[in-house]
């Protein structure tokens, strides 16, 4: 980013922070705050504020590119080593990024955002609300400002959980170490006598009802979804679909050959024939379809397990997009479009030099841009400059 581009974005950010009444987190004086500045390396950390006005004055003066705060509460948040801060508890943070979703590198920006939102909805509704029983007012949802979503669980039940307890929550959501014998149950349904007292037991493998709570019902619903999806496809398309769930060509063919109309009806009734290959295949695909990616990429420790995590401040701006870290009502999550709803800058035309071809839809406008000079609305210019696709260009 050249100097002119940096100064342009800083002016726009400064104007936003001068006029925005940013809500601070509860017990804000017990939080650590951190900042990354434009054109400067590193992070300014170990800062706390006693008054909201002190914080607002600071961000107007410094105009940071990124603003973070601690999910933890500290007795002394301003101290410069973690052991001296005296930890007092922490919110439970979930950070889903498009880069964590399999195949995201092959998707457009809009497609990646839509995919990660689907996984986020699954996390919030299926796991946090349904399985763990949190109330909606205990879940604070935000668009990250770039490529993902954050969920802050503020329930008193989680504040004192240590890292290992938080890891158990992650393991449950990811389906780690999910046992086949918990999901699939064998039951003796008949005995065949052969003389001299010999009997052969007839076993039936049963799957849970789709309306059961937790992973049992979740697996059942997913199995039925897969079956309904593949039963109307021709053989090659069905094999391709099964392979998309991580199944090999050979195993996919075996599944297709195994599933008859009669077996499909039996599975719908909660019964599946004794076939270890079939049950393992469907369990694997169900896990891949349901499990939510929670680990933070290449970082050493997943965000959710970190009891001292720094997370983006809600309603601050993201320095690489210009988008707002936008709060989202749970009821509106399905319809939330970050490329429309998190855009806060205006339509004033700005002259830029586009450095590489761009194809993106923002604020319901589709832009297909080529390398060269062009006039663009502020919101798009800031987005492209932040991403490194353009820079301010004088007359």
Residue spans for each PLM region:
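C-terminal accessory/binding modules appended to enzymatic or scaffolding proteins
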Residues: 298, 305-309, 314-325, 332-380
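A short beta-strand motif that forms the metal-chelation/ATP-contact edge
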Residues: 149-155
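Basic amphipathic alpha-helical segments that dock to polyanions
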Residues: 383-384
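A short, conserved structural fragment
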Residues: 388-394
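Signature for HUH/AEP ssDNA processing cores
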Residues: 1-144, 155-163, 168, 175-291, ...
């Amino acid at each position: 980013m050249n100097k002119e581009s940096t100064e342009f974005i800083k002016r726009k950010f400064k104007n936003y922070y001068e006029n925005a009444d940013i809500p601070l987190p509860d017990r804000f004086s017990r939080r650590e705050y951190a900042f990354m500045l434009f054109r400067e390396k590193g992070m300014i950390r170990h800062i706390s504020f006693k008054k909201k006005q002190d914080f607002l004055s600071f961000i107007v003066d410094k105009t940071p590119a990124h603003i973070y705060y601690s999910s933890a509460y500290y007795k002394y948040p301003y101290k410069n080593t973690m052991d001296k801060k005296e930890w007092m508890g922490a919110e439970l943070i979930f950070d889903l990024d498009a880069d964590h979703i399999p195949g995201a590198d092959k998707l457009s920006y809009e497609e990646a955002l839509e995919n990660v939102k689907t996984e986020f909805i699954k996390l919030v509704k299926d796991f946090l609300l349904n399985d763990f029983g949190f109330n909606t007012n205990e879940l604070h949802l935000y668009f990250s400002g770039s490529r993902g979503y954050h969920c802050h669980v503020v329930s008193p039940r989680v504040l004192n959980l240590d890292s290992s307890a938080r890891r158990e929550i992650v393991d449950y959501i990811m389906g780690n170490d999910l046992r086949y014998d918990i999901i699939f149950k064998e039951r003796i349904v008949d005995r065949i006598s052969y003389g001299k007292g010999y009997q052969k037991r007839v076993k039936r493998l049963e799957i849970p009802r789709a309306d059961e709570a937790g992973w049992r019902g979740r697996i059942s619903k997913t199995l039925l979804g897969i079956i309904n999806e593949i039963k109307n496809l021709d053989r090659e398309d069905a094999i391709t679909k099964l392979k998309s769930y991580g199944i090999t060509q050979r195993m996919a063919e075996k599944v297709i050959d195994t599933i008859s109309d009669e077996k499909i009806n039996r599975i719908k009734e909660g019964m599946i024939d004794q076939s270890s290959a079939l049950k393992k295949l469907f369990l694997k695909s169900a896990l891949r379809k349901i499990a939510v990616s929670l680990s933070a990429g290449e970082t050493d420790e997943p965000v959710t397990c970190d009891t001292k995590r720094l997370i983006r401040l809600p309603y601050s701006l993201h320095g690489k997009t210009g988008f707002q870290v936008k709060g989202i009502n749970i009821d509106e999550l399905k319809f939330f479009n970050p490329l429309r709803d998190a855009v806060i800058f205006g339509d004033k035309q700005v002259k830029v030099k586009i450095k590489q071809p761009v194809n993106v839809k923002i604020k319901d406008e589709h832009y297909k841009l080529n390398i060269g000079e062009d006039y663009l609305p502020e919101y798009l210019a800031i987005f492209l400059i932040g991403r490194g696709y353009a820079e301010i260009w004088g007359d």
